[in-house]
Amino acid sequence: MQLHGKMTATAKSCALDFLDFVNASPTPYHAVQNLAEHYMSHGFQYLSEKSDWQSKIEPGNSYFVTRNKSSIIAFSIGKKWKPGNGFSIIATHTDSPTLRLKPKSQKSAYGYLQVGVEKYGGGIWHTWFDRDLSLAGRVMVEEEDGRVIQYNVHIDRPLLRIPTLAIHLDPSANSSFSFNMETEFVPLIGLENELAKEETSDNGDKYHHPVLLSLLANEISKSLETTIDPSKIVDFELILGDAEKARLGGIHEEFVFSPRLDNLGMTFCASQALTKSLENNSLDNESCVRVVPSFDHEEIGSVSAQGAESTFLPAVLQRICELGKESSLFSISMVKSFLVSADMAHAMHPNYSSRYENSNTPFLNKGTVIKVNANQRYTTNSAGIVLLKKVAQLADVPIQSFVVRNDSPCGSTIGPKLAAMTGMRTLDLGNPMLSMHSCREMCGSKDFEYAVVLFSSFFQNFANLEEKIIIDE
């Protein structure tokens, strides 16, 4: 299905589906909610970590489980699977570099209402200046019966802005723009007025602007078709985002311009591939379990209850293996499994070509990229490359390779962490992109379909291919 020239209808449809997903997923909480809805629409059943699964899961069916509502694991059990057989896994993450409201966010200066924010992850922070910014996250509301319920909120309009200083007051701005993250990187949300002063006096909230709490309460009230009092908001986790929608760009719509490509791009492709792989009753002859974990907190190290270094994935795989009676079967399943760490990759930047290794440089719309690093910043090895090349050949999609220069630092992914924790064979890959960790990034519009088809082929062919690549007998 290799594509040449302009996009095919199916490639464009896949790219447009991604736009819908990323525009509806301003936070990990929204992403997980949308993933759950996608899985349920394809017959997946929800499982609670707090319940016993022994009587609930069985071969031939599909399930998903969430943790903290910001990480999710979906899996489909082949009808021929038995404890001791392997898992085919494509792991992604749901978070992106962003700005998060501080526990006490209320600020004001010279008649402006401001909010205090804390940086999350390694963003290119200067790209957040002079952008229309929205606000989204989860809000904890106390109900009349005393329960505290999470509501996802998205103020889907330009609400905040971090303005730059006029060049007349900073003549060096074009040659050496720099700023203090604490004092010169404070978003504006409005102007002080009599209404704001009155609400502050009535509410007495010293943590957040009362007008902000009222805005959140109104947003929740609209979704519930009832009235929520701002005083019932107990706490929240809110982050800023680019208010401009993701969209197609370029002369032939060959680009996608979007926030959060890293890593909702791969999260979208993996989830689509899992459900696509189930077509034509493919689980009937499947001897493995197909798994897509999407973790929170990758951008800050993955060390949390819902991050990739948590018990989440090992616990889920262990519970699936407990369908058998022998405790040793879990360890056997691990060594028979293969994990693909799917995280976006660096495409060639035409204005900075000297920063790239000449022979292993990916390009947009040329296929998914296998990432290699001798120092195990990426976990790819020759056995994994052989497997992915065969998977790509069966799917008739192109793949590329990426290696950093010897005089350049190298990023990493959840791949090495999961490989070390589980002992599973692991490979790192991702679709190529530009402006990684910017407030707004870009990638190729054809590469979404390439990745979905590649990942679906991996799920459908892993069991047969795994037996033919002999390493440890």
Swiss-Prot record:
Which Gene Ontology CC terms are recorded? cytoplasm; cytosol; fungal-type vacuole; fungal-type vacuole lumen
As cofactor, the record names: Zn(2+)
The GO molecular function terms of this record are: aminopeptidase activity; metalloaminopeptidase activity; metallopeptidase activity; zinc ion binding
Keyword RNA-binding attributed: no
What EC number(s) would the UniProt record show?
Answer: 3.4.11.21
Q: Which PANTHER family match?
A: ASPARTYL AMINOPEPTIDASE (PTHR28570:SF3)
Q: How does it assemble?
A: Tetrahedron-shaped homododecamer built from six homodimers. Interacts with autophagy receptor Nbr1.
Name the UniProt record assigns to this protein: Aspartyl aminopeptidase 1
Which gene specifies this protein's sequence?
A: ape4
